[in-house]
Amino acid sequence: MNLLRNALIGGIVLVSFLLIIRWNEFQERKFEETQLQQSSANNSERVAPSIPSEQPQAPNGEEVPDAPASDSKDAVEFTANADNDRQIHISTDTLDLVIDTNGGDIVRLALPQYYAMLHEKDNPFVLLNNNDTSTYIAQSGLVGPNGTDGKNGRPRFSAASSDYTLEPGKDTLVVDLKYQQESAIITKRFTFHRDSYLIDLEYLIENTGDTNWVGNLYGQIKRDDHNPAQAVGVGMQPFLGAAITTPETNYKKLKFDELAKEKLEVSNTGGWVAMVQHYFMSAWVPDQDKDQKYVLRKSRNANMYFLSFTTLTSTTVAPGTTGSIKAQYYAGPKHIRVLEKIAPHLDLTIDYSWLWFIAKPLFYALDFIHGLVGNWGLAIILLTCCIKLVFFYPSAMSYRSMAKMRKVQPLMNELKERYGDDRQRMSAELMKLYKKEKVNPLGGCLPILLQMPVFIALYWMIMESVELRHAPFFLWIHDLSVRDPYFVLPLIMGVTMWIQQKLNPTPADPMQAKVMQLMPFFFTALFMMFPAGLVLYWVVNNTLSITQQYIITRQIEKAD
């Protein structure tokens, strides 16, 4: 019995240790990431586009995917100067971005509704950027027989303005980039929507020649492997890397080092490809009814990673007609309900770990409660009460078992004094006593065993849900996704654990008793590193457990 109980305690300690390593790494990364956002924001400028060139311009160290019919084994790499005098600025209620007219790439994208730091609300979070510190951009173009992007470079588009703003009262903003081919007029159209992070991309091809225009659309995410957390900390951290859905698996993650070893090529009808980081992501979502070729790989000559799709079926535009090719690009927070509507399985980029089947319903419940009360802290408290109701009867059975254990504690002490030198005889007598008094010595472990998966799932849910990022509670707690700045909640949690121990029977094994006495102190130190939202759950859960256990214990004592 003692062996099983010690194994349980050891398992809890191990899980807690792994969780604290994870959370500590995340905190360190969050600080470093913030510094990067500040640097990026300060280096950004608004500049007007230059006069368009009739000839394609070679991109700066970029790679353009081959058309599906190409015999080339590798994409072509280019080198050229990247000027800052050819950019246009676009602003909506949710996005603040810069498009380079050379290729029509998104080279910077900030999220005005999300702050880099809680106390600096004038400094928006920067998701995409291209500077001396890091490279993370979204590219798209046309490849194939008549494509504008290829071995000879990329097109220089023209725009009607250098600044575009979504005006009050309007729900959409359309930005057209123009390029004149020898026998076609190419319009690259970006459509932005109010209260949305999803960008519609459409290529309009007006064939002014006397032969068919043939080409394929590609979309690509280009990023280096800069990891804001690599300078400090050890252990696990929130996932940073590529993600894709394939016919074989709904969600496949690939770290940078995996892509460096071997590229991934897959064909799929519809699908998506994404670059995932903590709280935020960007993803290309092509036409869900057409076949696409996806390639995820590392550049041959630079420390760059490319996640691309290319339409497998070429678009043919007859002379004197206009054709179009469409795709969508998402860049923003990982809102589960939003991602569910964009494409199948895109919501899996919210990494709830292996207990996702528990964490996901927990978030839906938490989100529903938040819609009623308007405060995430109160929602966590009410969710805790609901969870406690679910475990009410198993907990009651366990507390009755522990109350009976307290009742037979004097008899157990007598057996210990009588057979202390004969452990085998003492164990046999204890089993007889348990059977006679109808006591289950492991009954008190049941609530912990049942709640640990919920506790771990709740941890991941709080850690991965962008809705809790910078979400305030009351008084000194301004962000439930980070640790309590004054450690008030962890101290309260430690006190509740100590009170719970007083209600439980003292273990017969002296060593085990000492370990149990140290548990409140250990967990108090441990929970100082946990997010305040998670500690709040544990405090409320312990308080409700103490109340239930106290009532049951008194009822059994009065019955005697």
From Swiss-Prot:
InterPro entries with a match to the protein in the record: Membr_insert_YidC, Membr_insert_YidC_N, YidC/ALB3/OXA1/COX18, YidC/Oxa/ALB_C, YidC_ALB_C, YidC_periplasmic_sf
Transmembrane segments: 1-21, 303-325, 349-369, 372-392, 442-462, 473-493, 520-540
Membrane topology per record: Multi-pass membrane protein
Superkingdom of source: Bacteria
Annotated GO biological process: protein insertion into membrane; protein transport
Keyword Endoplasmic reticulum: no
Keyword Cell inner membrane: yes
Pfam families: 60KD_IMP, YidC_periplas
Gene Ontology MF annotations: membrane insertase activity
Subcellular localization: Cell inner membrane
Predominant cellular place of this UniProt entry's protein: membrane
GO cellular component labels: plasma membrane
Keywords: Cell inner membrane, Cell membrane, Chaperone, Membrane, Protein transport, Transmembrane, Transmembrane helix, Transport
Annotated Polar residues bias: 34-45
Residue span of region Disordered: 34-74
Protein family according to the UniProt entry: Belongs to the OXA1/ALB3/YidC family. Type 1 subfamily.
UniProt-listed PANTHER family: CYTOCHROME C OXIDASE ASSEMBLY PROTEIN COX18, MITOCHONDRIAL, OXA1
Quaternary structure (record): Interacts with the Sec translocase complex via SecD. Specifically interacts with transmembrane segments of nascent integral membrane proteins during membrane integration.
Functional summary from the UniProt entry: Required for the insertion and/or proper folding and/or complex formation of integral membrane proteins into the membrane. Involved in integration of membrane proteins that insert both dependently and independently of the Sec translocase complex, as well as at least some lipoproteins. Aids folding of multispanning membrane proteins.
Protein name: Membrane protein insertase YidC
Species of the source: Teredinibacter turnerae (strain ATCC 39867 / T7901)
Gene that this polypeptide is encoded by: yidC
